Amino acid sequence: MKLIRKYHMIPYENGSEYESAKRFLENILSASDVDPTTKCRFYQDVLYRIRNHPELPIVTEELFDVVQENLQQQNDNQKRNVKLERRNLKYEVIPEKRESYQEKDYTNPPVYKAENEQLFDDVPYRNDGINHLKPRKNVYIKEEPEDEDYHMEYEKIPEINMEQNVNELFTEPQKHAAGKIKKSKNQKKDGTLSRPLGKKENKSVVKVKIEEPDQDMQAAPPRKPEEKNEETAPVSIKKRSFQQDATSNKRQKFDLKRGKSMNNVKPRKLYKMQLDEEDEDEEPMVDETPQNTEISIKKRPFQQDSTKNLNKRQKFDLKRRKNMSRVRPNKIYKMQNLKRNISSTIPDNGTNIPAAKRRVLRGSGSAPPPGSRVYCRLWKF
C-alpha cells in the first residue's frame, strides 16, 4: 500500500464525491485478490488522511485501477522469487553405510594363554583316570515334629449317616445357672419371667485355721472406770415445745366475683416457744451496770527537791540517738530538726512569709538583675 503515496489526488466531479467514495471502499473490501492485512492497512491509511488532511479529496476509480495493477505486479514478483528459491535447492541423497560381512572360521579356534604360567608348574598332575578329590559330606535335614501351636485347631465334625437322626449327633450346649435378674419397669407383677431361673450357686466358704495362743503371752490388767468430776457433770438440756396457731390451718377463701383467691401468699406459721423452769443450781444474775459514786481525793502539797533523782540523769547524744550508759532512760528524746526556718534567717521580716527567690538557669551566663530576666532559652535567636 506504499504505492498510493506516489500518486497525486485527483479531484471529484461536482455531485459525485459521496457515491464514488462508497464504490471505492466497497470494491477494495470485497476484492478476493487482496489479503485481509492489506485491506486493514489501506483502511487505516484512508482514515488517517481524512482526519489530518480533510482538504484533500478521496481517490477516484481511475486511481483504484492503477492500485490494483501495482498489487498484481507485486504478487507476481513474490511468486517468481519463491519458484527461483525452490529451483536452487539441491537434495543430496546420503548413501547408507553398510559394514562388510566376513565369514568367520570356526575350524581353528584361538588359543588363550595364561598370564602367569608359573602358578601351574608346581601342581602335580596325575594321568591315572581317577578323581583324587575328596567328596564333600552330604548334608541331611532332620525332620522334626511340627509344633502343636503352629496349626489352628478345629473341632472334628463327625461323619453323618443318613439313617441316623441329625439331632442325635450334636450335643446340646451346657446350661449355666442364672443369677439375679433385674426387674424392668414395664414388667408385670403377676406375669412370669420368660427365662427359667436356675439354682443359685453357693458362695465358697473360706476355712480359717484356729491357732492356739502362745504360752508366754500374758493378759492385760483390767481397765478401771473413769471417775466423773462434778465439774464435768451432764448439763440439763432445755426442751422446746411448739404450738401451732389454729388460724393457720384454715383454708383460704375463694372469691367467686374476682375468680381468684384472696391471697396468693401462704400464711406464715407462728410458733410459741416455752422454756422449762430454771435449775436451782445456777447462780443468780448480778447487775453490773456502773453506779455514780463520789470518790474522795486528798490533795498533797507539791515539794520540789533539787537533790532528787540525780543518779538517774543521763547524758544522751541527740545525733546518734544512743544512750551513753547502760541504764535505759525514762524519757524518749526526739531528733532535732536540722532544717532552719527562713523566718529566723531574715531579721527584718516580721511575718513568716518567705522571701521570693530569683529563678536561676544553669549554664546561661551571669544572672541579670531582677525583673529583666527572659526565661526562654531561644531568646538569643
UniProtKB/Swiss-Prot annotation:
Top-level division of the source organism's lineage? Eukaryota
Q: Where is the composition biased (Basic residues)?
A: 177-186
Amino acid composition bias (Acidic residues), ranges on this chain = 276-286
Chain positions covered by the region annotation Disordered:
176-292
- Which stretches are tagged as biased composition: Basic and acidic residues? 187-212
- Report the protein name in the record: Uncharacterized protein F54H12.4
**Provenance organism:** Caenorhabditis elegans
